[in-house]
């Protein structure tokens, strides 16, 4: 496997056991299949989206450039936005079917507490880091939350279909050159580490599936 990455995308090359053009085409299909990508979504929990809510236009740039150990102080007094140094990790998130793919927001509280609100600003769940929270079909297990109290995070529980489609919209597989037998996998995005993690898991899943097919 060869790889080349940057802040906006990553490229990896794979030379599987390919015999002819038909096999190459079949392997390309497998690498982009719902079976492979679905396993990647499940393994990496890509159906859970949780990112700091930054101020439009300039907020993202300010947050990316911040290098302090603790969350940055709010700019312009806008303390509901994230200004850098925030972190969140959610191990599990379940919502009622009607809320799949709908935007939610998680608001950090004091001492590791949080509240989740829906688009109508209604609180649907309250909890604390390290403790599973449940309420009327909503369930969450937050394992890390680093933010000033009052900071908002964008939160979405994607359906499997939309999580797979999100990968496919930025993902491509093709043969490098003509009859080379080398497949190139590329993925675009804003987080180089996350991109490489996804591509690595696609490759690992593909290899495992090949082993299963041949056993």
Q: What role is predicted for each listed range?
A:
Residues 22-23, 176, 182-183, 190, ...:
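A short, surface-exposed, charged and often Trp/Pro-enriched helix-loop connector in the C-terminal portion
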Residues 18-35, 189-193:
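Soluble non-cytosolic domains of exported or imported proteins
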């Amino acid at each position: 496997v060869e790889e080349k990455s940057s802040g906006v995308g990553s490229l990896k090359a794979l030379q599987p056991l390919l015999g002819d053009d038909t096999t190459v085409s079949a392997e390309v299909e497998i690498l982009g299949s719902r079976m492979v990508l679905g396993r990647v979504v499940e393994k990496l929990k890509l159906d859970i989206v949780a990112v700091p809510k930054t101020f439009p236009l300039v907020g993202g740039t300010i947050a990316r450039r911040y290098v302090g150990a603790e969350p940055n102080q709010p700019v312009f007094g806008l303390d509901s936005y994230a200004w850098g140094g925030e972190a969140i990790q959610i191990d599990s998130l379940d919502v009622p079917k009607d809320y799949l793919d709908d935007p939610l927001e998680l608001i950090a509280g004091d001492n590791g507490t949080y509240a989740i609100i829906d688009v109508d600003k209604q609180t649907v769940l309250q909890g604390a880091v390290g403790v599973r929270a449940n309420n009327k079909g909503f369930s969450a297990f937050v394992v890390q939350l680093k933010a000033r109290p009052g900071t908002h995070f964008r939160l979405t529980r994607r359906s499997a279909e939309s999580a797979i489609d999100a990968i496919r919209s930025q993902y491509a597989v093709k043969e490098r050159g003509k009859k080379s037998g080398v497949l190139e996998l590329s993925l675009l995005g804003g987080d180089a580490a996350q991109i490489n993690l996804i591509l690595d898991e696609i490759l690992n899943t593909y290899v495992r599936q090949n082993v299963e097919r041949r056993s």
